[in-house]
Amino acid sequence: MEYEAVIGLEVHAELKTASKAFCSCSTAFGGEPNTHVCPVCLGLPGVLPVINRQVVEFGLKTALALNCRVAPFCKFDRKNYYYPDLPKNYQISQYDLPLATGGYLKINVDGQERVIGITRVHMEEDAGKLVHVDGPGGGYSLVDYNRTGVPLLEIVSEPDLRSPAEARAYMEKLRAILQYLDVSDCKMEEGSLRCDANVSVRPRGSQTFGTKTEVKNMNSFRALQRALEYEIERQIAILEGGGRVEQATMAWDESRGVTTVMRTKEQAHDYRYFPEPDLVPLEIDAAWIERVRRELPELPDARCRRLMDTFGLPAYDAGVITSSRDLADYFDRVVARYPDAKVVSNWIMGDFLRLLNARNLEPGQAPVPPEELADLLELQKEGTISGKIAKQVLEEMFASGKGARQIVQERGLVQISDTAALGKIVDEVLAANPNVVEDYRNGKEKALGFLVGQVMKATGGKANPGLVNKLLKERL
């Protein structure tokens, strides 16, 4: 029997506000443990929460960018459960009246566009963080409450995803949108973008959902894809063996490449939701919604279309460049100085991204300013350096932080375009390779490429390749 996966994602994005959701404590990452806390976020008696208006603003931007219907009336609720990192023993969240519902997001996998439904977008606060310590006589855990009360948006998809690759594409697209909106830094390694996956399998063609498990602890796009691949295979193996999938919360173990049972999956009633008595409901008028809509920035899909329409870039190239706001901004700044967009795209898609990935850097961390890359391309265009040398110069720019012209001058990399000087070297190469010359004259076109290579080798790659070709053909 052939099975298909049914996947829905619950994504938590920490918002880039200066203060927490319901108090004035800092949201800065990396502070000393338990220094960004106050009686409100610790849940001490005698204090009341106050909603941070920017949290609502960021929620509206996200909801509109995801094509959701914003509720004119919503409220907060208490989600009750007991865990050491939750000092109040409840989390302020939204239950039956969330901020927004009924949106969608478009993804593209293997050239196929799919529309993934967004069930809801709601606001809530984050919990603290447990730090597990191994010590003599047994381990113990410490609690850091700095993250407690940091504002989150939870974005819940419909169970419309049908493969781990689609789930990864969805997460990557969602991260891009959040970064374009500038509402979250989306640093998965710091926990500011987290994802839980609800996954089940069913016979292909069936409309009935199978028993789902929830998979947690996936802190990268690669981990998300690997965890889902394993969990889907695990569930199929159980069903094919005549067993039954048990509803549970699973943890992804990255080092072992397996999912393991954390606990039996809770139902909504286990959390005993009830309206938050210390916060009044929110009424969001149409004027506020329309102002936020007008102020939305150019989003990834629109920017991708602009690069295709304005510069004639292929859909794939435009999609890669606009998948990151920082990378798209970098491209625009290079093109502003060097207007051949296709050349810029080729360099960014090739050597630039290769060097970034080799150093595990994001586009916003590139050590080469866009103006310097434009300068490098100008040096190549004007014939000062060859394409091969330009690639070497870019590598040194990444390594040293120096500008292109400085490197070219210091290392004496200026392209040789002197006809007399090159002619002498060409003559020497022809004299040293009579058999190759004979091959070319007998119709073997590849022989010319060998001779060009020998001239380039003799000049340390500094010869003007166009002039070398011209001189060789004249002599042959």
Curated annotation (Swiss-Prot):
On assembly, the entry states: Heterotrimer of A, B and C subunits.
Protein name listed in UniProt: Aspartyl/glutamyl-tRNA(Asn/Gln) amidotransferase subunit B
Q: Which UniProt keywords apply?
A: ATP-binding, Ligase, Nucleotide-binding, Protein biosynthesis
Reactions catalysed, as given in the entry: L-glutamyl-tRNA(Gln) + L-glutamine + ATP + H2O = L-glutaminyl-tRNA(Gln) + L-glutamate + ADP + phosphate + H(+); L-aspartyl-tRNA(Asn) + L-glutamine + ATP + H2O = L-asparaginyl-tRNA(Asn) + L-glutamate + ADP + phosphate + 2 H(+)
Q: What class of enzyme is it?
A: ligase
Among the record's GO biological process terms, what is one?
glutaminyl-tRNAGln biosynthesis via transamidation
Give the enzyme's EC designation: 6.3.5.-
Task: Give a yes or no for keyword Ligase in this entry.
Answer: yes
Q: Name one Pfam family in it.
A: GatB_Yqey
Belongs to which family? Belongs to the GatB/GatE family. GatB subfamily.
Molecular functions (GO terms): asparaginyl-tRNA synthase (glutamine-hydrolyzing) activity; ATP binding; glutaminyl-tRNA synthase (glutamine-hydrolyzing) activity
Q: What does this protein do?
A: Allows the formation of correctly charged Asn-tRNA(Asn) or Gln-tRNA(Gln) through the transamidation of misacylated Asp-tRNA(Asn) or Glu-tRNA(Gln) in organisms which lack either or both of asparaginyl-tRNA or glutaminyl-tRNA synthetases. The reaction takes place in the presence of glutamine and ATP through an activated phospho-Asp-tRNA(Asn) or phospho-Glu-tRNA(Gln).
Taxonomic lineage from the root: Bacteria, Bacillati, Bacillota, Clostridia, Moorellales
In terms of InterPro entries, this protein maps to:
Asn/Gln-tRNA_amidoTrfase_suB/E, Asn/Gln-tRNA_Trfase_suB/E_cat, Asn/Gln_amidotransferase, Asn/Gln_tRNA_amidoTrase-B-like, GatB, GatB_C_1, GatB_Yqey_C_2, Gln-tRNA_amidoTrfase_suB_CS
Answer whether the UniProt record assigns the keyword Transport to this protein: no
